[in-house]
């Protein structure tokens, strides 16, 4: 159950426009059809307990449960409605989530995030202002871009990122170097130290980068079909019939990914409390796996029973391996979409250089390039930190996150 101090903080999520929109209707889809607000991650799935009773009480009409066994809430993939999954009554295999394009959000969601009525940053420092003393402005040579290679590995990623590096050199007239790192914490440190000038950070670590490294987030990626971002999914194995809701998690071995991860820890810590009255570290012991891949694999092989995960991360992992399938996982809840990790630049770069850097992402069609192949993004759109990241910052405020390097 929720401690009093958590209960007092609930209004921080529900009191804002996004939280109110989330409660307005049980939409479950990639946008909130009952509101102009996006409500990223603050899904209005109704009532905390959400249908965790009736484990194995007969069949559900699709062959998944009969004779007193099976998950009576598990539906056939064909029954999934991305506009209204009805999580309080339904579970689905991960294959249904993927096949119905529920992994990401839509352009309308991203636009609504940017239209939120937000006066100031919800948690932490506002964006840093450029130095008033022009002598403190930086015009680096070479220009260093820091990023974390994806599943394809460092060598393949370097080939795929080369079109970006070439475009940066063309736009800025500078030599551009790519610095690969093994974690987002290393990305933040490279930017903080001034060793790197541009970078790609994750959604959850964006506020750490702003507060610790004095960066400005300016662009987020969108796929060619207009989809963007990712969702928080609460997953288990398909054969775990007894787990039908996040409300069932306290009885099982739950894994989170990393402390600073938005979908892997920060968001579920707030939203599981909000919608299921389940408080991580109070109702169950949080065991960190070390990352989304580790959580997904650990659940598949039985090291863990269930946990939160980033939708695009598990999609990429399953697509990259032959030993696990989408049908191996069951989804018992999904959030509204979160924005993807942004592109950032240090605050103290020469203004003209900043404009050249922005143009590379915002004015280039990346369709058909290796960069699109690696990132999944054909286009990048301009973002405003205090608005597009408002819901993430509200979640981090709820969790009383302190922006210190030791918390990354």
Model-derived segments and spans:
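Terminal disorder- and signal-encoded targeting elements
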Residues: 1-183, 193-197, 203, 207-208, ...
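Domain-level signature for soluble enzymes in the chorismate/prephenate branch of the shikimate pathway
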Residues: 219, 241, 259, 287-301, ...
């Amino acid at each position: 159950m929720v401690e009093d101090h958590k209960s007092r903080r609930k209004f921080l999520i529900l009191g804002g426009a996004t939280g109110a929109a989330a409660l307005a209707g049980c939409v479950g889809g990639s946008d909130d059809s009952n509101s102009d607000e996006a409500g990223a991650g603050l899904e209005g799935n109704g009532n905390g307990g959400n249908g965790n009773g009736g484990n194995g009480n007969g069949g559900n009409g699709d062959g998944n449960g009969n004779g007193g066994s099976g998950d009576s809430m598990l539906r056939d993939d064909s029954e999934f409605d991305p506009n209204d999954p009805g999580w309080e009554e339904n579970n689905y295999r991960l294959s249904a989530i993927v096949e119905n394009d529920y992994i990401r959000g839509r352009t309308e969601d991203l636009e609504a995030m940017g239209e939120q009525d937000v006066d100031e940053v919800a948690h932490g420092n506002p964006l840093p202002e450029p130095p008033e003393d022009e002598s403190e402005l930086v015009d680096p040579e070479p220009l260093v871009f820091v990023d974390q290679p994806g599943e394809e590995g460092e060598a393949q990623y370097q080939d795929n990122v080369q079109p970006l590096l070439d475009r940066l050199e063309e736009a800025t007239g500078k030599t551009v170097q790519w610095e690969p790192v093994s974690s987002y914490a290393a990305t933040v440190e490279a930017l903080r130290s001034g060793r790197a000038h541009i970078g790609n950070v994750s959604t959850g670590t964006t506020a750490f980068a702003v507060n610790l490294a004095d960066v400005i987030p300016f662009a987020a990626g969108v796929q060619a079909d207009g989809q963007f971002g990712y969702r928080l999914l609460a997953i288990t194995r398909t054969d775990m019939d007894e787990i039908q809701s996040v409300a069932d998690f306290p009885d099982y071995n739950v894994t989170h990914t990393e402390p600073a991860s938005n979908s892997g820890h920060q968001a579920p810590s707030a939203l599981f409390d909000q919608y299921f009255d389940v408080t991580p570290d109070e109702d169950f012991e949080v065991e960190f796996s070390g990352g989304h891949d580790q959580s997904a694999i650990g659940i598949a092989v039985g090291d863990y029973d269930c946990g939160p995960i980033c939708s695009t991360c598990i999609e990429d992992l399953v697509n990259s391996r032959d030993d696990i399938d989408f049908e191996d996982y069951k989804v018992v809840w999904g959030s509204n979409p979160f924005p993807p990790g942004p592109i950032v630049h240090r605050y103290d770069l020469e203004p003209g250089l900043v404009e050249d850097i922005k143009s590379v992402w915002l004015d280039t069609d990346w369709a058909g390039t290796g960069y699109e192949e690696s990132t999944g993004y054909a286009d990048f759109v301009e973002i405003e930190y205090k608005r597009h990241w408002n819901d993430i910052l509200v979640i981090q405020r709820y969790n009383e996150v302190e922006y210190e390097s030791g918390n990354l």
